[in-house]
Amino acid sequence: MLKYHFPNVCEDELINIYSYGDFKGQGKYICLFKIENQSFLFWRNDKGNKIYTNLESISVEIINTNNTYNQSQNVCPQDLVDTYNQSQNVCPQDLVDTYNQSQNVCPQDLVDTYNQSQNVCPQDLVDTYNQSQNVCPQDLVDTYNQSQNVCPQDLVDTYNQSQNVYTQDLIDTYNQSQNVCPQDLVDTYNQSQNVCPQDLVDTYNQSQNVCPQDLVDTYNQSQNVCPQDLNVYTQDLIDTYNQSQNCDCGCK
């Protein structure tokens, strides 16, 4: 006979005994025995009686470690398979719900508190923010509009008068000084530029178009009429010329 133990199970730990899915009893674990290739569970029931049970027909659940040991050689009973799957792979529904609520979904009051504190400012802070950041107080808006976008009316009037519309006396002065010369300057200009003074006109006409009479006479006398001494050859020169051209000089 060989005595041995389940791994990591100590004596007197609380166990449940199942046979083909049916609950058979609860007791305290003592040890295991192996006799001629057969294994037996040695345990004590709730009445204190010591019992040997063949492990081939039972499965044992260690209560305090939540481990189930199926010692059958062929197939685990379906209820133990279900129990194992539920306890290992799938949490009981109440634990699943608790987990989902505590881990994935905050309780509604915490969600609300979070939303209010993190995502949504309290209404008074929202209002304060909107007023201080996004919307200026109305008096500041008015002041801003008046000082930035719209000049006070007296400044607008002053600007329009001084920038866009010249005062009438400046307009008149400008027109008179730039576009229209004063009449005396116009007259002077016309007289001095377009029409020469009469004495200059006369002088010009006399000096350019008509020579003075003495120059005309002198010119006519000097150009059209040879001086008397040049117009009439001396008689002795004429006679000499005629003799030299017309007379036979005796040369044959």
UniProtKB/Swiss-Prot annotation:
Region (13 X 15 AA tandem repeats): 68-246
Keyword vocabulary terms for this entry: Plasmid, Repeat
Sequence repeats: 68-82, 83-97, 98-112, 113-127, 128-142, 143-157, 158-172, 173-187, 188-202, 203-217, 218-230, 231-239, 240-246
Induction remark: Transcribed starting in early sporulation and into later stages; not expressed during vegetative growth. Second gene in the orf1-orf2-cry2Aa (cryB1) operon.
Origin: domain of life: Bacteria
Protein task: A protein probably derived from this gene is found in cuboidal crystalline inclusions, but is not toxic even when coexpressed with upstream ORF1. The protein runs anomalously as a 50 kDa band in gels.
Additional free-text comment from the UniProt record: Encoded on an unnamed 225 kb plasmid.
Protein name from the UniProt record: Uncharacterized 29.1 kDa protein in cryB1 5'region
